[in-house]
Amino acid sequence: MEFPGGNDNYLTITGPSHPFLSGAETFHTPSLGDEEFEIPPISLDSDPSLAVSDVVGHFDDLADPSSSQDGSFSAQYGVQTLDMPVGMTHGLMEQGGGLLSGGLTMDLDHSIGTQYSANPPVTIDVPMTDMTSGLMGHSQLTTIDQSELSSQLGLSLGGGTILPPAQSPEDRLSTTPSPTNSLHEDGVDDFRRQLPAQKTVVVETGKKQKAPKKRKKKDPNEPQKPVSAYALFFRDTQAAIKGQNPNATFGEVSKIVASMWDSLGEEQKQVYKRKTEAAKKEYLKALAAYKDNQECQATVETVELDPVPQSQTPSPPPVTAADPASPAPASTESPALPPCIIVNSTLSSYVANQASSGPGGQPNITKLIITKQMLPSSITMSQGGMVTVIPATVVTSRGLQVGQTSTATIQPSQQAQIVTRSVLQAAAAAAASMQLPPPRLQPPPLQQMPQPPTQQQVTILQQPPPLQAMQQPPPQKVRINLQQQPPPLQSKIVPPPTLKIQTTVVPPTVESSPEQPMNSSPEAHTVEATSPETICEMIADVVPEVESPSQMDVELVSGSPVALSPQPRCVRSGCENPPVVSKDWDNEYCSNECVVKHCRDVFLAWVASRNPNSVVFVK
């Protein structure tokens, strides 16, 4: 910095709150003539606690020894310490080396004021390298606290936040002309080179840092992806290489394996590739099964009978959302009709479309849990105590069709539903008792439509052919029309299911037709035990796995509850033995002898029906 003209110039710093900055005092600077000097190296400390500090200037070698004012200045303030403008120091800190143009109050007399008034940023060659030693080396230096500087210079220093420079120091330097060429061009270049490295870091305290996203934990049951063919080869060869070179690093082993893989024959590579393809197929299968298991994690279990009736608790929604295209409206206007229940033993192999009676069209599904007391031991042992009830429709009387059943689409990959005798008997007991408490536990697959107040018995005792009806007292009438299907009877319920309800009155007649053999034509087989009462006829489509759809008509009549049916027994007339599980005779006979006798009886009956007068002997 150069003071031209050799005149006595005064630097006035206003501020009554500190003795160094009082307005009454003026700092008398010595007359230096035309000499040029540079401020010694100053380093900029970014510590917010050192927001404002005094700058130490060393002017020992630059002072005029013949000046009389030099002695008084040294006696009063010390030769080594000269309090340079505080605003200038803060301007250096705030602007990254440039002076604060508006917040510095300087009264420069004579030629200095006229030369610098048009360009407020004063150009000073300040190599900022070591400011700490100059600041901390002199104990007599004082600092101004934050509030004083804010009130005096109009600076904002809140929260230790350093404002970014409004104008780059290069622009300030380039737009500020040096009045008397006091700064060397080399010094300016050095200053510009040092500025980018010395810029202070802008600290933003107002913004909150975003929390890092938590990665979802991997399910240990999820199948692992198969590795590549090269990875399989790496596993096989890594142990051998490690055995030969125990001190080899992983990088060295990788290089050796890579070279071995490159030199490997195509046929040997194909072996690893085939292993990878097989593992990939297994992975895709396991992944599909895993996803299906995740979508429908339903467990069916039986509960103990609760003698205390409780209020109906809301049932959970079905496993898969119902199709909105075919909603079945709920109906509660069936006081005189029996409940239509189809019992199924699969776990969760269908999607339920249930009558929408709740707010927002959400499906309301009533669960029916058959208690352990009503389940025979054969059910608990064979089916594991798992019972699934397919919800059927509740219909109004006088033949009004209410809606379609809430049976849903069974995917081809899902297991077909198998209707068993023991499950049907359990459903019959549940429907007859009508004293089931509201369910305590409600597994999703166990579903049934709301029950009407009448007591009814529903029995479907149809296993694979030959068709056999349950023994029932006369008040109960069951008519089943079912085409013969290859055993065992595996059926799908195909959407949209066709369900009709009609009301008929039948005369009190009893008809019976002989049982059909296994290879009989698909004629309707009817077993009737009727009474002159209203009949609820339910028609549903039952489709086997491979065969074409067949129609099953079930007519249910109102009447008194019927006792439980006996345990399954051999099909041959007169044999009371339970059937033996065998694929040769469709699990319907107890032995080979019963199979032969039954076939002989059926054949003799057929011959007798065609020619009553002839007598046929069969060996």
Curated annotation (Swiss-Prot):
Keyword terms of this UniProt record: Chromosome, DNA-binding, Methylation, Nucleus, Phosphoprotein, Transcription, Transcription regulation
Residues recorded with modification Phosphoserine: 178, 182, 315, 531, 548, 550, 558, 560, 565
Region (Disordered): 155-227, 306-335
Domain of life: Eukaryota
Cross-referenced InterPro entries: HMG_box_dom, HMG_box_dom_sf, TOX_HMG-box_domain
Means of activity regulation: In liver, recruited to target gene promoters following treatment with dexamethasone and cAMP. Binding is decreased in presence of insulin.
A UniProt-annotated Pfam family: HMG_box
GO MF terms, alphabetically ordered: DNA binding
Compositional bias segments (type: Basic and acidic residues): 183-193
One Gene Ontology cellular component: chromatin
Compositionally biased region (Basic residues): 208-218
First-listed, main subcellular location of the protein, grouped into a coarse class: nucleus
Modified residues (Asymmetric dimethylarginine): 479
Induction: In liver, expression is increased upon high fat diet.
DNA-binding region location: 223-291
Modification Phosphothreonine occurs at: 176, 313
Loss of function: phenotype: Conditional knockout in liver lead to no 10% reduction of glucose levels after 4 hours of fasting with an improvement of glucose tolerance and an increased insulin sensitivity. Conditional deletion in T-cells leads to impaired T-cell development in the thymus, due to impaired activation and proliferation of CD8 cells.
Subcellular location: Nucleus; Chromosome
SMART domains named among the record's database cross-references: HMG
Bias type Low complexity, positions: 320-335
Protein's job: Transcription factor that modulates cell fate reprogramming from the somatic state to the pluripotent and neuronal fate. In liver, controls the expression of hormone-regulated gluconeogenic genes such as G6PC1 and PCK1. This regulation is independent of the insulin receptor activation. Also acts as a regulatory component of protein phosphatase 1 (PP1) complexes. Component of the PNUTS-PP1 protein phosphatase complex, a PP1 complex that regulates RNA polymerase II transcription pause-release.
Subunit structure: Component of the PNUTS-PP1 phosphatase complex, composed of PPP1R10/PNUTS, TOX4, WDR82 and PPP1CA or PPP1CB or PPP1CC. Interacts with PPP1R10/PNUTS. Interacts with FOXO1 and CREB1 (increased by cAMP); FOXO1 and CREB1 are required for full induction of TOX4-dependent activity and the interactions are inhibited by insulin.
The protein, known as: TOX high mobility group box family member 4
Organism of provenance: Mus musculus
